[in-house]
């Protein structure tokens, strides 16, 4: 009986997550017999409660690539501290390859001002008011990874105070 309840709770937790496909691209591998075609899917998964992840999957069909991307995204979940204004605590920069992302907290009601895969990441993380700028690259995968790198660097005010040895 108790096993059934646990599985129901797990299913409820699973339904909170949303998935958005950023890019599906047909890629080729040159082999002795010619070219082997496969598909690469870039997918972002988040629960709009401060958790988000980027997944990449490759398979011979699109559905298989998306499934692999979902499982990869669940392994790479990042926790995001969100303020009471549904923004981020401070300005932060992230980098992946040539892609750079700058994120700044914004006033309530301004919305998510960002482009491409960075916008998708911020929306699925649950951030409502933010300014973000992509620099250096148009590659959606590197921009998504740069955004998650920036979100990893975020700290709450209490975490910063604790790091500095200040107690209030």
Swiss-Prot record:
GO molecular function annotations of the record: rRNA binding; structural constituent of ribosome
Cellular location(s): Plastid, Chloroplast
Domain of life: Eukaryota
GO biological process terms on file: translation
TM region(s), chain numbering: none
Keywords: Chloroplast, Plastid, Ribonucleoprotein, Ribosomal protein, RNA-binding, rRNA-binding
InterPro entries cross-referenced by the UniProt entry: Ribosomal_Su5_D2-typ_SF (IPR020568), Ribosomal_uS5 (IPR000851), Ribosomal_uS5_bac-type (IPR005712), Ribosomal_uS5_C (IPR005324), Ribosomal_uS5_N (IPR013810), Ribosomal_uS5_N_CS (IPR018192), Ribsml_uS5_D2-typ_fold_subgr (IPR014721)
Ubl conjugation recorded as keyword: no
Family according to the record: Belongs to the universal ribosomal protein uS5 family.
Matching HAMAP family: Ribosomal_uS5_B (MF_01307_B)
Protein's job: With S4 and S12 plays an important role in translational accuracy.
Subunit structure: Part of the 30S ribosomal subunit. Contacts protein S4.
UniProt free text on domains: The N-terminal domain interacts with the head of the 30S subunit; the C-terminal domain interacts with the body and contacts protein S4. The interaction surface between S4 and S5 is involved in control of translational fidelity.
The protein's name in its UniProt record: Small ribosomal subunit protein uS5c
Organism in which the protein naturally occurs: Rhodomonas salina (Cryptomonas salina)
Originating gene: rps5
């Amino acid at each position: 009986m108790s096993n059934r309840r646990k599985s129901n709770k797990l299913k409820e937790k699973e339904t909170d997550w949303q998935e958005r496909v950023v890019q599906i691209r047909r890629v080729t591998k040159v082999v002795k017999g010619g070219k082997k075609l496969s598909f690469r899917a870039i997918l972002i998964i988040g629960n709009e409660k401060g958790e988000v992840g980027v997944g990449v999957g490759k398979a011979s069909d699109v559905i298989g690539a998306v499934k692999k991307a979902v499982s990869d995204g669940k392994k790479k979940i990042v926790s995001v501290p969100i303020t009471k204004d549904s923004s981020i605590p401070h300005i932060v920069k992230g980098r992946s390859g040539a892609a750079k992302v700058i994120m700044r907290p914004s006033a309530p009601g301004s919305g998510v001002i960002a482009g491409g895969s960075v916008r998708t990441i911020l929306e699925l993380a649950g951030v409502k008011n933010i300014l973000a700028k992509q620099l250096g690259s148009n590659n959606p995968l590197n921009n998504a990874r740069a955004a998650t790198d920036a979100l990893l660097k975020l700290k709450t005010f209490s975490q910063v105070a604790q790091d500095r040895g200040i107690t209030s």
